[in-house]
Regions:
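Periplasmic/extracellular loop-to-transmembrane helix junction in inner-membrane transport proteins
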Residues: 2-38, 60
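Hydrophobic alpha-helical elements at and bordering transmembrane segments
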Residues: 24, 28, 32, 66-73, ...
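Hydrophobic alpha-helical transmembrane segments of multipass integral membrane proteins
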Residues: 29, 33-41, 45, 49, ...
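Transmembrane-helix boundary motif in ABC transporter permease subunits
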Residues: 38-71, 84
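Amphipathic cytosolic juxtamembrane alpha-helices at the membrane-cytosol interface
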Residues: 57-63, 68, 127-159
Length: 184
């Protein structure tokens, strides 16, 4: 701290990155872009998947059991494996090179199980009396889900999204292989 404070300057947050001026601002901006685009891709898919699994699919069906096992398995995979998958699938196979889109899709695949699981648990945590009251007032299944269940489950869903943001910002292994390391 004593040696670092004298080195703080306005150049530390300039838009130009060079070997002489190693600014942090391009990295911060790229992190914000990456986080926003990943959430834009993963949150709708995750929430709608959770709605389907919690509200529409039969809990005892073989399909739902397979999806839940796959979701739990994907949650435990290390980020380096996701990075290698993204590298092979997007950087090499699709010939995208190191790019923001390769990093975004890889991170979206990585946080999707987290968003699905937390959203599914939040939706299942909504008391059935809310659903029954909505049906009793004449609302259909879709209206009940979007007007009653989702607003009631929103705190749990937002908790999952915040956890996903933390994972997106903290994962470097997946980005080294897909988005590269040098800010441009």
């Amino acid at each position: 701290l004593i040696k670092g404070v004298p080195n703080l300057s306005a150049d530390l947050f300039s838009l130009k990155y060079s070997s002489a001026n190693q600014s942090m601002l391009p990295s911060i901006i790229n992190t914000v872009y990456l986080t926003a685009l990943t959430l834009l891709l993963a949150v709708p898919v995750g929430i709608f998947s959770a709605i389907y699994l919690a509200e529409y699919a039969r809990k005892s069906s073989f399909f739902v059991k397979i999806i839940n096992v796959a979701n739990e398995t994907l949650s435990g995979i290390p980020s380096i494996v996701y990075g290698l998958f993204g590298f092979l699938a997007f950087v090499i196979s699709k010939k995208w090179g190191y790019s923001l889109s390769a990093g975004v899709i890889t991170l979206a695949i990585m946080v999707l199980p987290l968003i699905i699981r937390t959203s599914q648990e939040a939706i299942l945590g909504v008391d059935n009396s809310f659903r029954e009251a909505s049906y009793g007032l004449g609302a259909g299944k879709l209206r009940t889900v979007f007007k009653i269940v989702l607003p009631s489950a929103m705190p749990g869903i937002l908790s999952g999204i915040i956890l996903a943001i933390g994972r997106i910002v903290g994962e470097t292994a997946a980005l080294i292989y897909t988005a590269g390391t040098v800010p441009e």
